[in-house]
């Protein structure tokens, strides 16, 4: 069955793994995905009566023996908590890093991109719901250890390992181990996340990451609660923590007609970003296309994305972008001082790069990012 990569959703050598697109019955699960190792989780505490409390994400699930947390990929076995998705990869591809999107991070390079099943929120507009909203036994996967990932990433010519497609927070231990090993072999790691994570595990993970992309899905609690089964405040806490630890990060907002597309919301969000994160954080306003549980709304009008970008510029943010509109001038990076184009893009391709020693070649204005 076709997945997000066209003919298949995971190709590794002569191995082919496709996403599950049907709801499996318990009977149909028998014999699927057997033999994957489990690993004890890193962030939880033991309670009475063999219960545990997960301390990874803001949900702080309390889990009885032989039950799982909200994410569906972490299980209590006899009073100890285990991840079921360590090295259990269900989606894999080599992408341009611009696809993440990361525009101020090693432009023009490749990212070895992988995912396991599971997520800790349920966004009604999720484009990768076939893996994010399924349990690991419902999605065909292959065993790919951190050692395998590092080896294959280097063979592919990738500079970076990207944890993406589903939600990396729920495969935290796998990401942690792989990023740690990758660093030893000269590979950077980036987390493409919803930002729904507690501060302690985030700080520990940041020691092994080079960059993070956070989806700021809206700037209202109402949207998060009704459309994502989550909360806004923990995501804002994640962003401020990333700022405090000195992590390079970029923000993406998927703009959905009638749900999070008001000028008022854009102004409030951009004002908060400037005040709490600074003017140099890139923000990508990306175009929505109908999918999953929101198929009744049209694609985002380009003029709405342009309005959002103009609001960001008016607020004083230096690097707002228009996303999912290939060829739009809002894909380019402009020098905030002289206003000339520093990097010209078309989709995921770099057409021109006028950086010189990480500065605008025309006026020597430093352009923040990780460029080498």
What does each model-found stretch correspond to?
Residues 16-18:
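Cleavable N-terminal signal peptides
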């Amino acid at each position: 069955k076709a997945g997000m990569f066209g003919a298949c959703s995971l190709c590794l050598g002569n191995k082919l793994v496709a996403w599950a697109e049907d709801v499996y019955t318990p009977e149909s699960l028998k014999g699927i995905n057997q033999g994957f190792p489990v690993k004890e989780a890193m962030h939880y505490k033991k309670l009475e009566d063999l219960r545990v409390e997960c301390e990874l994400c803001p949900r702080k699930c309390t889990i009885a023996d032989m039950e799982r947390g909200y994410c569906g990929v972490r299980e209590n076995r006899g009073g100890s908590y285990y991840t079921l998705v360590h090295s259990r990869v269900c989606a894999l591809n080599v992408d341009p890093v611009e696809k993440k999107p990361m525009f101020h991070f090693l432009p023009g390079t490749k990212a070895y991109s992988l995912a396991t099943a599971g997520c800790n929120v349920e966004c009604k507009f999720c484009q990768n719901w076939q893996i994010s909203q399924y349990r690991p036994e419902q999605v065909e996967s292959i065993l790919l250890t951190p050692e395998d990932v590092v080896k294959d990433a280097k063979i592919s010519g990738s500079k970076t390992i990207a944890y993406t497609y589903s939600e990396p927070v729920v495969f935290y231990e796998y990401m942690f181990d792989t990023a740690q090993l990758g660093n030893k072999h000269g590979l950077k790691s980036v987390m493409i996340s919803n930002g729904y994570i507690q501060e302690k595990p985030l700080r520990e993970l940041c020691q092994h990451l080079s960059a993070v992309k956070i989806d700021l899905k809206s700037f209202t609690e109402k949207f998060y609660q009704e459309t994502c089964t989550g909360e806004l405040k923990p995501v804002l806490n994640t962003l401020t923590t990333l700022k405090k630890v000195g992590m390079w990060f970029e923000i993406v907002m998927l703009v959905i007609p009638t749900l999070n597309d008001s000028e008022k919301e854009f102004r409030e969000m951009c004002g908060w970003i400037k005040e709490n994160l600074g003017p140099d954080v890139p923000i990508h306003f990306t175009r929505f296309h109908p999918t999953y549980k929101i198929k009744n709304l049209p694609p985002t009008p380009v003029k709405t994305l342009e309005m959002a970008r103009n609001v960001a510029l008016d607020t004083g943010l230096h690097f707002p972008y228009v996303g999912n509109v290939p060829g739009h001038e809002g894909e380019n990076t402009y020098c905030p001082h002289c206003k000339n184009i520093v990097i010209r893009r078309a989709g995921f391709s770099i057409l021109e790069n006028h950086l010189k020693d990480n500065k605008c070649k025309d006026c020597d204005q430093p352009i923040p990012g990780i460029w080498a």
